């Protein structure tokens, strides 16, 4: 899917601070509030929408937790609240594996027996043929999901604070028997990422959380992203509540030993940190274009899963990232929607405090539809004068761009490459700008007046 994605990368350290108009911000807030799962006590949610190089919105709804992680949430949620990201962790672990491949420490085509002790391979996993690292990454290993083992699930729910070893987790999956011959089919399995955690630790000699911190979180300045050291989260955060059913009922999973989720769901973060991570990943600032293309290539046995990355389409634009549930519901995606207002797609990240929130219908699709429909009224996209209009022509152009407005204000004109590099900046003194002499290609034209900004994708030829 690499060819579908054009991204402006202004910064992976700080998201730009320009904001949507009040009208758009209010509409996004209403989508978030309407998505709170009904029938629950004090649900909460946070969401971030980021248009690369342009606009950034974060919102919160309902309630979160402060001071203690047990009981019903009572604090008004804010957009900086932290949360357990669930299986979004898989995207980070897969990135780490590909980073290790780039440094020559492993190959994803290697058999896992090169890195794991023989008794674990032969006595516990007992696959009918060899299993590769790549098959762990894309869930074609045939090793069963530990979460599907009812005995192990009840043991975990009975005492969420007890320590779980990686080998226990592997046994919970493998003891169910091989689901299929490795490479012959597809089945989502948390056990695959437990094994990847073991391989990363074997190769690096570091704990997984240390490797993530050193190679991803710190370089990207993700100050609110970490693997917790203790069962409780000390900062303000969203809780985790799962209606499991008999005999447990509603389970408060806010306090949990992080070892239960190691390798597949143990990271804690915020919506803006997650957006920074995905922007950096897709912008090839963590791994190379070659490695990224491997992540984005769906396995033939699954039409929508690559290497630790979910790959969807929404009407018909690409939509890639990952979802997650650990007593809550999370999502982190990039849409390559391309309109005059959103020429380079957008990022969305969110978390809801209850597992099973209808996020695909109530969040992902509704946000996409709303942002796409903004094309019908571009002046409402940003704060500005009512009825403001900007015409840019001809487009494509050989160099001269005419700019016509229905208001009288000084205009600052900035031309960017599709990678976010400023090419030319000037104040419009007449009715046109001249870009003759620049290389042929696609550029982003940003037109800013006193209180509004318009963007337009232009083609020079």
PLM region spans:
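Bacterial Sec-dependent N-terminal signal peptides
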Residues: 1-23, 381-382, 395, 421, ...
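Residue-level signal for well-ordered, solvent-exposed loop/turn and beta-edge residues enriched
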Residues: 54-55, 105, 341, 345-346, ...
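A short, polar/charged loop-to-alpha-helix boundary motif
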Residues: 65-77, 359-366, 433-437
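C-terminal outer-membrane/trafficking sorting elements
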Residues: 384-461
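Short active-site loop at a secondary-structure junction
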Residues: 39-43, 68-135, 180-189, 262-263, ...
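Catalytic loop of the DD-peptidase/beta-lactamase superfamily, centered on the K-T-G motif
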Residues: 19-63, 80, 114, 213, ...
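Short, surface-exposed loop or secondary-structure junction motifs
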Residues: 54-55, 63-67, 123-325
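Short, conserved phosphate/pyrophosphate- and ester-handling motifs at nucleotide-, phospho-/glycolipid
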Residues: 90, 270, 395
């Amino acid at each position: 899917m690499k060819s579908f994605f054009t991204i402006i990368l202004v910064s992976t350290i700080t998201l730009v601070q320009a904001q949507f108009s009040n009208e758009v911000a209010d509409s996004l807030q209403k989508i978030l509030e309407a998505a709170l799962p009904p029938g629950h006590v004090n649900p909460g949610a946070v969401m971030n929408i980021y248009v690369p190089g342009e606009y950034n919105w974060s919102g919160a709804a309902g309630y979160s937790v402060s001071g203690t992680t047990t009981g019903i949430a009572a604090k008004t949620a804010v957009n900086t609240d932290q949360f357990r990201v669930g299986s979004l962790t898989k995207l980070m672990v897969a990135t780490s594996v590909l980073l290790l491949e780039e440094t020559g420490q492993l190959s994803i085509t290697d058999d896992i027996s090169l890195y794991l002790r023989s008794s674990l391979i032969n006595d516990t996993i007992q696959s009918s043929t060899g299993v590769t690292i790549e098959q762990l990454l894309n869930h074609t290993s045939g090793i069963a999901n530990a979460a599907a083992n009812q005995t192990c699930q009840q043991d975990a729910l009975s005492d969420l604070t007890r320590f779980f070893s990686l080998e226990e987790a592997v046994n919970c999956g493998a003891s169910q028997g091989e689901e299929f011959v490795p490479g012959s089919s597809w089945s989502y399995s948390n056990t695959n990422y437990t094994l990847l955690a073991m391989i990363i630790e074997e190769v690096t000699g570091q704990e997984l959380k240390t490797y993530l911190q050193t190679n991803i979180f710190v370089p990207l300045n993700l100050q609110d992203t970490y693997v917790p050291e203790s069962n409780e989260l000390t900062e303000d955060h969203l809780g985790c509540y799962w209606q499991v059913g008999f005999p447990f009922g509603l389970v408060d999973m806010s306090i949990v030993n992080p070892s239960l989720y190691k390798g597949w769901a143990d990271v804690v973060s915020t919506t803006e940190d997650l957006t920074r991570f995905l922007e950096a990943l897709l912008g090839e600032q963590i791994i190379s274009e070659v490695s990224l293309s491997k992540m984005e290539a769906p396995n033939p046995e699954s039409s929508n899963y690559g290497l630790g990355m979910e790959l969807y389409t929404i009407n018909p634009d690409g939509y890639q990232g990952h979802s997650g549930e650990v007593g809550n519901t999370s999502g982190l995606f990039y849409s390559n929607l391309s309109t005059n207002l959103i020429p380079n797609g957008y990022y969305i990240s969110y978390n809801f405090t209850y597992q099973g929130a209808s996020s695909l219908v109530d969040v992902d699709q509704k946000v996409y539809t709303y942002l796409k429909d903004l094309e019908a009224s571009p002046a409402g996209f940003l704060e500005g004068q009512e009825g403001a209009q900007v015409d840019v022509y001809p487009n494509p152009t050989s160099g001269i761009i005419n700019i016509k407005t229905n208001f009288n204000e000084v205009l600052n004109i900035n031309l960017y490459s599709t990678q976010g590099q400023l090419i030319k900046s000037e104040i419009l003194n007449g009715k046109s700008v001249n870009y003759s002499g620049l290389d042929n290609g696609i550029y982003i034209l940003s037109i800013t007046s006193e209180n509004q900004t318009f963007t337009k994708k232009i083609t020079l030829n």
